[in-house]
């Protein structure tokens, strides 16, 4: 993938960049693997805002992705690499020998026509999926399960990868993109390789409207609100807030830890950061 720059024909175009989409081979998705997405505008069933800064955006069709990779020992061929509006990574359409077709997250350096397989003793090759117990220490992996058979939940964004660091008893130690070191049950499945589209992080949006196309609404700073709307609001002229930075509900922010204790904390070997 490469980054395309535009001539500065307008202020919004001046610093705007986008993908060249050279790795995408078709713009026609597999109809049998499409679903609908209903927009909520960030509201729940009472009509109250539960997710701020959400609303609008271009209409999308959902692509059903095979995160479980439970189709064991059936070889499949990469039929196409496609754009998915619902995620930063590209997706690959896999055509299996029994005739079934499924989408998977497209790994880096996987091309149309290559064969992949999911199984206990699959080759150590990008796109193949297998339990952590059969993956060599030091391998780069993505789409990692946290519970056996639940499907991959970790490391699915464009350009990300984890590294299998060690195996001890029933658990494998995996270094996540955040830097966190985590123990994961050794029978959980993962996919070999790095997620593709690793230039995604270098894309410059360029203008506010392009963010609105993505379904994101503006974020208003607390210090420019009125006192009724935010703890840091009010004051004559441009005031600095008068208190430590906080959320609209008074919870400290900008570095304050808000993560609650969980029963799964025991699986974290080393915190991120």
Swiss-Prot record:
Pfam families: Ribosomal_L2 (PF00181), Ribosomal_L2_C (PF03947). GO terms for biological process: cytoplasmic translation. One of the primary rRNA binding proteins. Required for association of the 30S and 50S subunits to form the 70S ribosome, for tRNA binding and peptide bond formation. It has been suggested to have peptidyltransferase activity; this is somewhat controversial. Makes several contacts with the 16S rRNA in the 70S ribosome. Part of the 50S ribosomal subunit. Forms a bridge to the 30S subunit in the 70S ribosome. Residues 262-273 have a biased composition (Basic and acidic residues). InterPro entries: NA-bd_OB-fold (IPR012340), Rib_uL2_dom2 (IPR014722), Ribosomal_uL2 (IPR002171), Ribosomal_uL2_bac/org-type (IPR005880), Ribosomal_uL2_C (IPR022669), Ribosomal_uL2_CS (IPR022671), Ribosomal_uL2_dom3 (IPR014726), Ribosomal_uL2_RNA-bd_dom (IPR022666). This is Large ribosomal subunit protein uL2. NCBIfam families: rplB_bact. Belongs to the universal ribosomal protein uL2 family. Residues 223-273 are annotated as: Disordered. It comes from Syntrophus aciditrophicus (strain SB). One of its GO terms (molecular function) is transferase activity. Keywords: Ribonucleoprotein, Ribosomal protein, RNA-binding, rRNA-binding. GO terms for cellular component: large ribosomal subunit.
């Amino acid at each position: 993938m490469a980054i395309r720059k535009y001539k500065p024909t307008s202020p919004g175009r001046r610093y705007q960049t986008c993908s060249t989409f050279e790795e995408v081979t078709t713009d026609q998705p597999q109809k049998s693997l499409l679903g609908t997405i209903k927009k909520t505008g960030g509201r729940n069933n009472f009509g109250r805002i539960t997710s701020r800064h959400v609303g609008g955006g271009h209409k999308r069709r959902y692509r059903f992705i095979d995160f479980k990779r439970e189709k064991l020992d059936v070889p499949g061929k990469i039929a196409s690499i496609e754009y998915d509006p619902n995620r930063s990574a590209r997706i690959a359409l896999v055509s299996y020998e029994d005739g079934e077709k499924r989408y998977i997250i497209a790994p880096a350096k996987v091309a149309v026509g290559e064969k992949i397989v999911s199984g206990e003793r699959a080759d150590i090759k990008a796109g193949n999926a297998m339990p952590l117990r059969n993956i060599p220490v030091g391998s780069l992996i993505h789409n990692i399960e946290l519970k056996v058979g639940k499907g991959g939940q970790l490391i699915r964004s464009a350009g990300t990868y984890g590294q299998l660091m060690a195996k001890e008893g029933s658990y494998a130690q995996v270094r996540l993109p955040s830097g966190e070191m985590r123990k994961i049950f050794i029978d959980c499945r993962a996919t070999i390789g790095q997620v593709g589209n690793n230039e995604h992080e270098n894309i410059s949006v360029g203008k506010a409207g392009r963010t609105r196309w993505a379904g994101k609404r503006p974020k208003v700073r607390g210090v420019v609100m009125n006192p009724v709307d935010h703890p840091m609001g009010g004051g004559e002229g441009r005031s600095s807030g008068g208190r430590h930075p906080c959320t609209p509900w008074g919870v400290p922010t900008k570095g304050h830890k808000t993560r609650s204790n969980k029963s799964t904390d025991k699986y974290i070997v080393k915190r991120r950061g």
